[in-house]
Amino acid sequence: KINKNIIKKYGAVSHECCKAMVRNLSKISKSKINISITGIAGPGGATKNKPVGLVYIGIKKGKTLLIKENRFKSNNRNSIQKSIVREVIKIVFNLI
């Protein structure tokens, strides 16, 4: 669960929300690596400040916490989703 105030203040697609997601997941999961993703893959949902392709990836491994903002340049939902998966794999690979 994410504190409603975080979503009200920053939005569901935000650094702060992604961080809260991965931190909370690490509290309830027995996994050594936890991952959260929030973003706008399109085709709808974009705003001037949060365009299609804006994605936050959160990864927590032990005490290491990484939140990465990405701006994928495609307007194709499937392409953005594939790019997210590639980016997550790359980050996790570098952490292990």
Q: What residue spans do the PLM features occupy?
A:
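Short alpha-helical segments enriched in small residues
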Residues: 1-96
